[in-house]
Amino acid sequence: MRSLKLAALVLFLAVLALPSTFNRIAHSQSSEITDASEPTISAEEAASTAASTDQANKVSGDDDTASKSAVDNEGVAEGTSDTFSYDAEIDPAGASADNRTPPDIRCPQPPPIGKAPADFDNKTNGVVPQGTPVPPGDEGTLGTFEGDKFIFSVVDEIDDGLGPVYNAQSCRECHQNPVTGAISQINELRAGHNLYCNAHGVCSGTPCAGCSTLFVDAPGGSLINDRGIPTKNNNTPPFFGAKVQERVPPLYTASIIGGPPLLANEKVRTFRTSLNTLGDGFIEAIANQTLINIASNQSSATGGVVHGQVIKVPVLEVPGCNPNIPSTCPKRVGRFGWKNQHASLLSFSSDAYLNEIGITNRFTLHENTSLGRSVAPFDNHPDSTFVPCDSDPSKDCGEDPEEDIKAFAEFMRATKAPPQDPDIQATFAADIKIGRKLFSKMPDAAFSCSICHVPKILTSPPCTWINGGTFLLPNALGNKIIMPFSDFLLHDVGTGDGIVQNGGQKTRTKLRTPPLWGVRTRDRLMHDGESLTFREAILRHAGEATPAINGFIALSEADKRRLIMYLESL
C-alpha cells in the first residue's frame, strides 16, 4: 500500500514542524483527584477488570529480578560460567557468550572490540549498505539505509490502513530531531485509575490506610490516542464527524461510538515523550545477562537502595508465538519503551505501527478500540479479512502486506548512536572535565548519577543469536562499546507515572532510565516533558536517586554549573 503514500510525503515534510497542542494535565498519580466514596468490589473482580481493560497493550512481561536470575540462558554459552561484565573498561571481554555461533561463512573472524560509530550524519552504521536517496515517485530499494529510512518516513493514509484511532502518520513524525530516527518534542497521552484493596480483598476508589494499590487502565487500554479518522454521521449523509475520537473519561454524552456515557473518572493521567531510536541496534545487541548483572551490581553496591528491576517480555517474531497468549512466546529482557515493553526492534516496530499509527500487521492483527468500543464499522480493512504477506502468502499481514515493520526495524538497527558534542567539550574542557567526574563520583561512586545512567556498555559479540534465535548479530553491531548513559532498567526515582504495562503492579511507580546520549537535542525533559531545564530535571528525582540528589544539592553553585555543562555536551 506504499504507492498511495508517496504523494503525501512532500506535504508531510512541509508541515512537520507545526507543533501539536496539548492541554496540561496532572502527570502522575501523586496529583490524582479524589472523589466522594465509590462503589467497592472484590480484589478478584478488580484484578479481572485490570486484565480485561488493557486492549492496547497486547502482551505483558514478567518480573525477573536479578536475585532470581543469576545466569540467563541467552546470556551464557552452554558449558561456560561467563556471566559478563557491563564495564567495558574493566572487563572488555565480558559479553562473550550469547548463544555464540562458531565462525563460518556467515561469521568470519569477528572484529576486535571497538567504539560504536556515533554521528548525526544520516549514514549507516554498516548493518546495511547506504544506498542512494529515494527520488520523488519511487518506492526505493529496501535493504539499504536510504530505502529503509524512506519507509520510516512515508506518510500513511486511510487507504493504507491508518487508524481508526492513531497518534501519527509516520514513524518520522515522532522521531526526527535533528535527523530521522532521533527524538522529538512530541508526547502521547495515557490514563487510568487506581483501586485500593484492603486486607480482606475489598477494593474501592477511595484511598485507605494499609491498602494495596491496583492500577486499572482506561477502557480499551491506558493509551488515549490523539487522533481519529472521520466517521459518518447517521443523520447527515454528506457530512462526517469524529465519533472514534478518544478522550480521557468521564464522558457524559454518548457522542462516541456506541453505548452509554463513560462515567468512570480516570484520575491517573500522564504524558509520555517520544524516545530516541538512533543507536537502538546496539541496545538490542546488549546481552540479557549484561542487564541482569547491572541490576545485581547496583543492589550490591548500594545496599539495596538502588535496585533496577529487570522484566522479561515476549519476543513476538519467534515462530509459534501468539501475542494474545504470552505463555507461547519466548521472552527476553525488556529494554525498549518507557516501561521496557519490548526486547526486540521488530516487536517494538509492530507494537508502534498499531498503537501509534493504527496499522495492523503480522504480529498485531487486531485494531485498537475507541475507549473499549469496537471501531469495526469505521475500519476500511476489517480484522477478519486475511491479507497475505507479500513475502509469504501463507501468513496474514493485516494492513501491512509489504511488512514495513521489517524496514522500520532494519533502519533502527542501522542507525549510528547519538554523538556527544566535541565543540562544546573542547571549548569548555576544564569545566566539563570536572562535570564528568562529578557525574560518576558525586556523592560517591556507589550513589552517583552513573549508577543508573551507565556511561559505557559492551554489546554481545558478532554471530550471537538473539531475540529467541531470530536475529544473528552482524559485525556492525557486535563487540561495540556504546555510551548510552542508561542501564535500561526500571527504577522508582519519584517520578513514576502511575501506569502499569509490563511486569505487574510493582512497576506502577517505575520508569526505564532514559539514555542521555543526545539529550542536548531535547528541550522538554523527563518522561512527561514537564521539566524544561537540566536543573529542574535533576531536582525532580527522589526515591532511589535521593542520595545522588542530596549530593547535587550540597555542591557549590560552580560545581552544579559544571555538572550541567557536561550534560549539555551529551
Regions found by a protein language model. Give the residues of each.
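Periplasmic c-type cytochrome electron-transfer domains
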Residues: S20, H27-T34, E38-E45, S52, ...
